[in-house]
């Protein structure tokens, strides 16, 4: 597949963020770049119903266009770090990484599990959910404010609209929070991933570039996982 098509797929991912992030963006923010749309949550978290937790340090918000059954964003409110690239955060600001991990695994774990049950099934145990949630950054984020993705593995969602969406969360483009610094990718080197064949994250079956077939399969995989998990 040509490099031109690769670039087109990457542009699809980056341009998809132009969808509005909030339902009612205040007038003072409406003319700013779409890449700054997460800023409203950091500055005025109390104003938005999709914010489920905030304190002086972080904000936890439901992604308005989730790419899985459950898809949350955890954002630092530190003005000195919110615009730092996630790969630089992973490499040079380990204290922030550790703080975010401590929120996910500690103070916010109950909220995250409850949110997952609300989105998937109330019958799921914390143990089942713990193995079905991934946490990480995009190597090439489409939004300016640093945001950590906390999401279930299913990738079953109407907002998962194209191959680029799926690949961005199921390839090395999605950098898991526990990735060693020695294994971090170099910025700007992963765009070739967007030309690869689509592959089920769970069973490994490949679908070429047939996104519609993949989406149907992902629903089947989710249904199978859920049936087995609630029967345990």
Curated annotation (Swiss-Prot):
Changing residue 138 to A: Decreased enzyme activity. Mildly decreases affinity for DNA. GO terms for cellular component: cytosol; nucleus. GO terms for biological process: mismatch repair; single strand break repair. Changing residue 147 to N: Loss of enzyme activity. GO terms for molecular function: DNA 5'-adenosine monophosphate hydrolase activity; DNA-3'-diphospho-5'-guanosine diphosphatase; double-stranded DNA binding; double-stranded RNA binding; GMP binding; guanosine binding; mismatched DNA binding; single-strand break-containing DNA binding. Residues 63-67, 138-149, 161-165, 209-212 are annotated as: Interaction with DNA. InterPro entries: HIT-like, HIT-like_sf, Znf-C2HE. Keywords: Cytoplasm, DNA damage, DNA repair, DNA-binding, Hydrolase, Metal-binding, Nucleus, Zinc. The keyword tRNA processing does not apply. Pfam families: HIT, zf-C2HE. Changing residue 130 to A: Decreased affinity for DNA. Residues 38-160 form the HIT domain. The keyword Coiled coil does not apply. It catalyses: a 5'-end adenosine-5'-diphospho-5'-2'-deoxyribonucleoside-DNA + H2O = a 5'-end 5'-phospho-2'-deoxyribonucleoside-DNA + AMP + 2 H(+); a 5'-end adenosine-5'-diphospho-5'-ribonucleoside-2'-deoxyribonucleotide-DNA + H2O = a 5'-end 5'-phospho-ribonucleoside-2'-deoxyribonucleotide-DNA + AMP + 2 H(+); a 3'-end 2'-deoxyribonucleotide-3'-diphospho-5'-guanosine-DNA + H2O = a 3'-end 2'-deoxyribonucleotide 3'-phosphate-DNA + GMP + 2 H(+). Zn(2+) binds at residues 200, 203, 217, 221. Its EC number is 3.6.1.71, 3.6.1.72. The record marks 41 as: Interaction with DNA. Changing residue 34 to A: Decreased affinity for DNA. Changing residue 41 to A: Mildly decreased DNAppG decapping activity. It is an enzyme of class 3 (hydrolase). DNA-binding protein involved in single-strand DNA break repair, double-strand DNA break repair and base excision repair. Resolves abortive DNA ligation intermediates formed either at base excision sites, or when DNA ligases attempt to repair non-ligatable breaks induced by reactive oxygen species. Catalyzes the release of adenylate groups covalently linked to 5'-phosphate termini, resulting in the production of 5'-phosphate termini that can be efficiently rejoined. This is Aprataxin-like protein. It comes from Schizosaccharomyces pombe (strain 972 / ATCC 24843). The lineage of its organism: Eukaryota, Fungi, Dikarya, Ascomycota, Taphrinomycotina. The gene is hnt3.
